[in-house]
């Protein structure tokens, strides 16, 4: 008698979530650098309105905001307007305890490029920051 294979769907979903961590960070960096949270301080706006204020491409910004809305960073209403959530408040520049500046720092090449070379770092036993 053979036993049924274990159900790995939950583990697969959790691991996939971790796999997409870089995407989440890149989206947070993008909206932080553009000042989206500051532009939403006065109330909800569409991605097109935010694109006009930030200089970003509207359809691409809309995709980023929708992704972040699935993570409860922003809220999207029935009119496709985006609003701040308590989490997004921490991306504003004028919020006490803001994470605005740390997100900007972590999104810069100084940090991203060495992370992309982590395999070589571990294989060679030296830091990628030297490259």
Segments (PLM) and residue ranges:
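Conserved Class I S-adenosyl-L-methionine-dependent methyltransferase catalytic core
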Residues: 2-55, 59-131
